[in-house]
Amino acid sequence: MQNKYPLLSQINSPEDLRLLAKEQLQSVADELRAYLLESVSQTSGHLASGLGVVELTVALHYVYQTPFDQLIWDVGHQAYPHKILTGRRDQMHTIRQKNGIHPFPWREESLYDVLSVGHSSTSISAGVGIAVAAEKENAGRKTVCVIGDGAITAGMAFEAMNHAGALHTDMLVILNDNEMSISENVGALNNHLARIFSGSIYTTVRDGSKKVLDKVPTIKNFMKKSEEHMKGVISPESTLFEELGFNYIGPIDGHNIDELVKTLSNMRELKGPQFLHIRTKKGKGYEPAENDPIGYHGVPKFDPTCGQLPKSKTIPTYSDIFGNWLCEMAEQDSKLIGITPAMREGSGMVEFSKRFPEQYFDVAIAEQHAVTFGAGLAIAGYKPVVAIYSSFLQRAYDQLIHDVAIQNLPVIFAIDRAGIVGADGQTHQGAFDVSFMRCIPNMTIMCPSDENEMRQMLYTAYRMNTPTAVRYPRGNAQGVALAPMQALEVGKGKLIQQGQKVAILNFGPLLNEARIVAEKHNYTLADMRFVKPLDEQLVAELADSHELLVTLEENAIQGGAGSAVNEYLQKIGKIRPLVMLGIPDFFVPQATQAESYADLGLDAAGIEQRIQAVVNQ
């Protein structure tokens, strides 16, 4: 490694980086970018975001005394360069793998990871808390939050900035704006003015003038307006952040490491809330990623020399099946509306957005708004479908209850990534949606066992006039044939196999694993389909005719489908031995989906072992 990366190989911590001359930093950035590309192409992971913040990462760790100074990355997709510079360079080959380093900043992993993240727009709120604590302790430490132009659109980010401005907290928010390539207003003039506005002479004169002019409000207001006008000429965005109480600097070139170091060095000495706007290019330095930053956002293993990603398998994903269903229904119903909170690609809605632009709404990273926006459409007679990841629906729980369920509005929730998601780890597992939805009156919850069932359930939800949820997993579908759409009888499961002694009640896509066990031991197998309303008649019949009941689901055991079965049996006084298989009471770490199923006992071998342990007692 030393021959290929002569500078980077010597950097085992930011302390090593800070020993280098400033003139060497661009070479460090070049090596870091090359190493990042080499590493991610061999492991899979998030690529384009990290390529875009290489210079910023080097400059931040060079100027700020991390880990004493607190550096917080929002979401964490862009934090791979940060991990490489903070002692984890030689472990990058394990990222996103079982027992490897975490795909996002993770407090348990490193002192340099101040906040564990994975979801967006949390950095500034945590940063305000950390900065307030530092002020109370007179610690002298600095707090820096790096947030992207997507994440900053979320309401939580503005709530935090509004609070920070009111508190006049010493902290720096850096907006990494990579929505477009470096534009004409990011150049010599902007870089020069950024140094002026962030410099000690300017800020000392400005702050001193404010104190003197407090007694002359007319002149004070004139000077304030003049400063705002000058900043506004350079960057119209500045007014918004200035009104929130931040001193706005920028935009500056986020790939000019000399200017970044100069500006950050100035801003580190400033008091109060500071806001630095930088412009970067997502995928910087690797042309295919620059040209297709969305495609190279998260990548599988690939050969970077060929300039293209490997083609996906021919079996469609559950997300693809959902997108196709949405298009099929939109052809028949112009009042069907598809809604996504900034997850068009992940949720399989690209084709729908192109074919039916008038029926498609991307509301940005605003899950709360997405749900209540859907409620408003339902009130007006439309048929909204909110396509959302299970872990992101958590962010809109009050809206689900207050704005949809209480009013019994026909909003369809297409819940993607339900269950075990794999390499993204704890923050992205879809482990809780059944539990937190099942207790809500008026909700109908469906768990398809394959893509055909999924289509029928989505169609069933479309035909209903109440809140509905269809939850389906990440990854490839089963490859079964798709039948013509037909509404299912609500609350009715189906018997897959009649057996003896043991009955397995399956909820969701683990049906094939259960089938292997049922066929081997001649157990009864039922595909329950609905968590709510539960097929109580089928549960009662199986309880009467079997010695042991086993529930199987990809959700937390607490409050899940198994709990629903247990509650019903208690209600009717049928006390039977019951084994509830699902996700235990801990946050499931990163691994492949297959590895997680095995670890949790949710594959065929694990299911068989758990059942046999009870049968043999």
UniProtKB/Swiss-Prot annotation:
SMART domains: Transket_pyr. The keyword Magnesium applies. It catalyses: D-glyceraldehyde 3-phosphate + pyruvate + H(+) = 1-deoxy-D-xylulose 5-phosphate + CO2. Its EC number is 2.2.1.7. Catalyzes the acyloin condensation reaction between C atoms 2 and 3 of pyruvate and glyceraldehyde 3-phosphate to yield 1-deoxy-D-xylulose-5-phosphate (DXP). Belongs to the transketolase family. DXPS subfamily. Homodimer. This is 1-deoxy-D-xylulose-5-phosphate synthase. It comes from Actinobacillus pleuropneumoniae serotype 5b (strain L20). The lineage of its organism: Bacteria, Pseudomonadati, Pseudomonadota, Gammaproteobacteria, Pasteurellales. The gene is dxs.
